Amino acid sequence: MKRYDLRHLKDDFEPRMKEILGETHKANETLIFLFEIGDFTPIQRSADLVKECGYELYNSLKFNEVDWTIVVKK
């Protein structure tokens, strides 16, 4: 399991998330991403990106007032 905190990137987290998803990960490895949600549009964009990169979205939940967490697996 690997955790990636992308909150410091604010609304520009998608290029970094795509880069991470493009890296080689062990089979069935779980990845956890944290990012800022702002107006909630990043949630759908992140789900679309996960699917586009060939991963399965396991969980998506609000972490606190401004942060979101998603759990994905290859």
Residue spans for each PLM region:
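Amphipathic, hydrophobic secondary-structure cores in small proteins
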Residues: 29-33, 46-49
